[in-house]
Amino acid sequence: MVVSFLKELLNFRSITPDDAGSLEFIAKFLPDFEAKFIEKNGTKNLILSKIYGDGEHLAFAGHVDVVPPGDGWDSEPFTPLEKDGYIYARGSQDMKSGVAAFVCAAKEAKFEGKLSLILTSDEEGDGTYGTPLALEYLREIRDLPKFCVVAEPTCDKKFGDSIKVGRRGSINGKIVIKGVQGHVAYPEKCINPVNLIAPLLSKIADHDMDGGSEFFSPSKIVVTDIRGGMQVCNVTPSELSIMFNVRNSNLTDVNDVESYLRSVLDGLSYELSIKQSSKRFLTNKDSKIVRNLMASVTKITGVTPLLNTKGGTSDARHFAEFGVDAIEFGVINDRIHAKNERVSISEVNKLYEVFKDLIENFY
């Protein structure tokens, strides 16, 4: 059932933030669940919920939107192709396989509490009208889940090898070094910002702000762009700009990064802009959702998953901000956002079994 459902879901050309009708399709697939659509500026979110008993409130979450397919595919990106044990289509790994797995598990599994499915079509883009709107609604009606599994593709080499219990934060910034433009033949009459930053760049690029912790790697300043001048050989630039990103751990915050950079740049004429684009989060490894999902993964796959926080940001951070114990688990992520994206059919079936086992044994 889950594979056929996934194929139908992959047919929807749901390029972010357009769900292309996929959310209605999912809602109709689960007629026993109460459906609540939350829409703003043409962007849709869907909350499906069902009360089975007096037990705890468990949720699954995911996004149906995908990035544009781009060129160079060997098949039509929105016509799923089954070949050699894989399904090829845009969104097959990221993350319609995860959505299909928990939707089908919710349809078949028995539960003792309240089960919710929280879906958005605004994750791959800005996310302005996505998951946070759905969570704000649930908070207003006092119906936030206690636990949530976000079915992002998390596994690395082998299905079952990785559960994300957190994510690093993301800090973006820009440094502008001020100089005085002039003729290269008269360097004594110029203040070249390239010369100013050259001896300091090694203190910025790839600098570790901390030594990392149990679940987080060090917070490293990564320079992403350096530019200045007019692309000519006989004029020194009036300024030079450096853009950077820091994926920060629990040991470093935006103020730490700003203070460090200002100490390095002390004495120069410069401007610094910096902001926390997304917050880091970490769910306690002893949380019930972590322990139970680990048990289900090991039971179904025979693999003991590693708890980690690797990778970029995801919507799990929003759940954490609302006080929900959130973790992530899904298929292998070796083809996400790539041409000829594909997912293993075996992994899809196993993911469905993991989620079904988690639901039925969540007590």
From Swiss-Prot:
Cofactor details (free text): Binds 2 Zn(2+) or Co(2+) ions per subunit.
Query: PROSITE patterns per the record?
Result: ARGE_DAPE_CPG2_1, ARGE_DAPE_CPG2_2
Keyword terms, alphabetized: Amino-acid biosynthesis, Cobalt, Diaminopimelate biosynthesis, Hydrolase, Lysine biosynthesis, Metal-binding, Zinc
Keyword Secreted assigned: no
Q: Which residues form the active site?
A: D65, E123 (proton acceptor)
Entry's Gene Ontology molecular function annotations: acetylornithine deacetylase activity; metal ion binding; succinyl-diaminopimelate desuccinylase activity
List the Gene3D superfamilies: 1.10.150.900, 3.30.70.360, Zn peptidases (3.40.630.10)
Source domain of life: Bacteria
Cofactor names: Zn(2+); Co(2+)
Q: Which pathway does it take part in?
A: Amino-acid biosynthesis; L-lysine biosynthesis via DAP pathway; LL-2,6-diaminopimelate from (S)-tetrahydrodipicolinate (succinylase route): step 3/3
Name the InterPro entries on file. Answer: ArgE/DapE_CS (IPR001261), Bact_exopeptidase_dim_dom (IPR036264), DapE_proteobac (IPR005941), Peptidase_M20 (IPR002933), Peptidase_M20_dimer (IPR011650), Peptidase_M20A (IPR050072)
Enumerate the residues binding Zn(2+) 2. D94, E124, H337
Q: Which Pfam families would you find in this protein's record?
A: M20_dimer (PF07687), Peptidase_M20 (PF01546)
Any one Gene Ontology BP term: diaminopimelate biosynthetic process
Annotated positions binding Zn(2+) 1 = H63, D94, E152
Spell out the reaction equation it catalyses: N-succinyl-(2S,6S)-2,6-diaminopimelate + H2O = (2S,6S)-2,6-diaminopimelate + succinate
Its job: Catalyzes the hydrolysis of N-succinyl-L,L-diaminopimelic acid (SDAP), forming succinate and LL-2,6-diaminopimelate (DAP), an intermediate involved in the bacterial biosynthesis of lysine and meso-diaminopimelic acid, an essential component of bacterial cell walls.
- Which family does the record claim for this protein? Belongs to the peptidase M20A family. DapE subfamily.
Q: What protein name is recorded for this chain?
A: Succinyl-diaminopimelate desuccinylase
